[in-house]
Amino acid sequence: MTGTLRADLIEGAARLAAADGEFGLMTAGWDGAIVLACGRESWRVPLKGGRPAAVEPLTALPAPAQDTVVITAAPAAWREFLSATPVPPYSDLFGAQRAGRMNVAPVLTTAPRHQAVRRFGWLLREAAGLTPLTPPVSPSPGRAHGEHDDAVGRYIHLDVEGVRHRLYYEEAGAGVPLLCHHTAAADARQWRHLLEDRRVTSRFRVIAYDLPYHGRSLPAGERWWAEEYVLTRGRAMGLAVTLAAALDLDRPVFVGSSIGGMLALDLARYHQDTFRAVIALQGGLRSSGGLSEEGMARMRRFRVDERLVDPALPGARQSGMMSPAAPEAGRQETMLHYAQSAPGVYAGDLYFHSVDHYLRGEAHLIDTGRCQVRLLTGEFDYAMVPISQTAAEEIPGATFTLMKGLGHFPMSEDHEQLMNYLLPVLADYA
C-alpha cells in the first residue's frame, strides 16, 4: 500500500493528464479546476482549455461548481484508493463516493466532465507508480475480412398487453434455448460476445432481444412520443414469455443482468413452468426502493431532469460499478450503449428495477424444483452483493456465487471473466 494523497502525486497526475488523450478529449474547453483535499490539506489543479497547469496549494476549499470540481476524503480513504489492489468501493472515485467514503462535488451534469474526473483519479494511481488496474488494450483476433458473425438478427411481431410490438432479436447456436436480457437503457449488443462463443452456442440456442424503446426495437403505439415510457413488471414478463412462446422455445433458460436479473426472479415466481431455470446476474428480491408514491415521484423527477443533461451520463455514473480490472474496451463499449439511449428510457427502466419489482415476502413461493434459481453477482457492484445474498438465502434451493473481478455489467465489461462463472452453471442444463 502506498501513502496517502500528496502534492507530488497530484503534480505527477497533472503532468500525465497533460499528455493523456482520453483526459484531453473529456476536458476540451474546460476552464476551471480540479481541487483535491486530504484531511486538512488541499490542492488546486488549474485547467485552461482543459489543459492542466501548475498545481497550487490551498488554504481554503473553494465552493464547488461545474467548472470547479472538489474531491474530498480522509487520509485513510485516499490510502485505500491508492493501494495496489483496491477493494470495492475504492477502485473508483465515484464508487467510493456512492459508498460514502469520498465526496465529489457538485453533482456533475455531463458525461465528459464525469469521465475526466474519473480519469484523473486513475492517473493519480499511475503517478504513484501503481500498476494500471485496467489491462492494456490488445487487438482482438476477430473475424477475417468478409466473414460473417454467427449471430443473425430478425424482427418478430408480438402482442403484449393489447399492443403490437415489433421486437428485434439476435440468435446463434442450437440446443437448449437460452434467452438473454440486457440491462437498463442498453440493448442486446451487451450479449454479442456470448452469441459468438462456441463453447456456449455448440450446446445452446442463444437468443438476445431488445426491449421496446431500446436498440433496434422501436416504441410501439400510434402516438408513443406523447406517452410516458414506463417499464412495468407485467410488460417485462409479458415480453419474455410471449417471445418464448412465439419462437416455440421448450422451457428455455433465462439469463439477465440488472433489470434482467430482477426480471429473472419475477419469471421464477410467476412463470415457473415456462422456464427450466433462471440465472440472475445482479439480481435480488428488491432494489433499495419499494413500491411507494415517493418512489414513483422520484422516478418521474429523474425522467424530467434526464432530458436536460447528456444522455451518456447514466452510463458514466455507473462506471464505478464496473470492475477496474475489466478490459478498457469493454468498459467503454458498455458506456457507449448507454450514451445511445433515448432520454427518459433509463428512468423508465428504473421504475421496474427500483419500484415495480418487489418480491420480499414471496421468496418461499418460488419453487426451484420446477424452475431452478442461480444468482451470480459481481463484487464491484458492491451494493447488490448483500441483496443477492439475501435472495439466495430466502429462496429455497437457490444458489449464490460472488463473481470476483466483475461488476454490474459482466457480459459486456469482461466476457471471458464472466465465462469462468457462467459456463459451470450452463453445464447443468446442456
Model-derived segments and spans:
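Short beta-strand/loop motif that positions the catalytic acidic residue
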Residues: 369, 375-377
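Feature captures hydrophobic
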Residues: 1-146
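Conserved alpha/beta-hydrolase catalytic His-Asp/Glu region
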Residues: 289-294, 308-367
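Flexible "cap/lid" loop of the alpha/beta hydrolase fold
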Residues: 265, 269-270, 274-308
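Conserved alpha/beta-hydrolase "acid-adjacent" motif
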Residues: 382-387
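Catalytic active-site module of serine/aspartate enzymes centered on a nucleophile-bearing elbow/loop
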Residues: 398-430
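Conserved HGGG/HGGXW glycine-rich cap/lid loop of the alpha/beta-hydrolase fold
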Residues: 161-223
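Active-site loop/oxyanion-hole signature of alpha/beta-hydrolase fold enzymes
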Residues: 162, 208-255, 420
